[in-house]
Amino acid sequence: MIGKVDMDYASLEEEYMTESEMEDYLDELRHKIPSFIVELLKNNLKNRNLTRNQLNKIVNRVSDLYFGKKPEDKKAAELTNKINDLSHKLDALMKVATVSSATKVSDDIKKEIDNLDELDLAVESPRIESPQTLEPVQKIEEIDEIEISEIDTDDELPIYEEELIPEIELIENPEVDTEVDTINSENYNSDVVINNSAKIGSLPEPTKELDRTTGLENEVKIPMDYVEVKNMESEIAKINENTRLHELPEDTLSTMLIFKWLEFLISRVGTNNLVDVLDYYYTLKWISGKSVNKLLKISKNMKYFHEDMEWKASKSMTPEDHVVSLLYIEKLAGRPISMDELEEMEREITRIKKWANELQTL
């Protein structure tokens, strides 16, 4: 019984449709495709013998051509889905590879640092234990003892007493004065006199140099206020050279852009907090001090009326508002940023946000 029903249904599909059936079938498609396409199909399919399957294929083909659909679109969609899946997998693999490589590099650096510390310890230990440095010291001590024994202390001592005292008075060093006060002229030994005389004999030379330098300082006196002003001017010049916007242009388009920028800033923070925002941009080296002064002069006679009567200005701006200000600054400086660069920047930001979210989920 089921086989008979299938045969009857297949025979109906293979039978040719009459013109009235074709018109009824096409009229039912008016809510799916435009009416002019239905009229074109009626005119082109007159006096043709077509089955229901053939008519369905013709209608589907015409609708696909009209709506811009091609049989290749499905394949392209599948390919794009596969490519997206592969790109996600590659991103995950790259993240794993970067983490593993970073850990390997950190381990290698730690090993190299440990090896360097061991080498430093191995190099320093023989230097401390080397007996060669002690030999010249012993020789010097022996020579000093021989020279001291050969000197007649009775004849030499009064001379050193008379020569020591005036030389010590010339030196303006508190450390030397304290050392000299501790020496008693009556109870000193011959060893002490000889060693101190050798030291003090070389001291008057720097005192003479000090006297010369003090004389030059007395002759040439530069006022400190002048030096500070010069230093301030040089620092301000360096800051202005490194700013993004050194000076505001004066053409008509630039002045219109300046008014728009000030209107944007006042709409965010109001006129009272405008000075703080401009000072913030000055500290970031976005604009120069000259530009800040000119912007404040322009904003003196500006008023902003908000649609909301209960609106209150905030003391700070959002990061998006600062980005808009940076775009205004680059435009006024003659370096406008194209839309392609902005779109690339937005894509990079979205990628970074996705990576951050994926890392948090790991």
Swiss-Prot record:
Keywords attached to this entry: Archaeal flagellum
InterPro entries per UniProt: Arch_fla_DE, FlaD_prd_arc, Flagella_assembly_related
Superkingdom of origin: Archaea
Any single Gene Ontology cellular-component annotation: archaeal-type flagellum
Compartments in which it is found: Archaeal flagellum
Biological processes annotated in GO: archaeal or bacterial-type flagellum-dependent cell motility
Similarity annotation: To M.jannaschii FlaD, also to FlaE.
Protein name stated in the entry: Putative flagella-related protein D
Organism encoding this protein: Methanococcus voltae
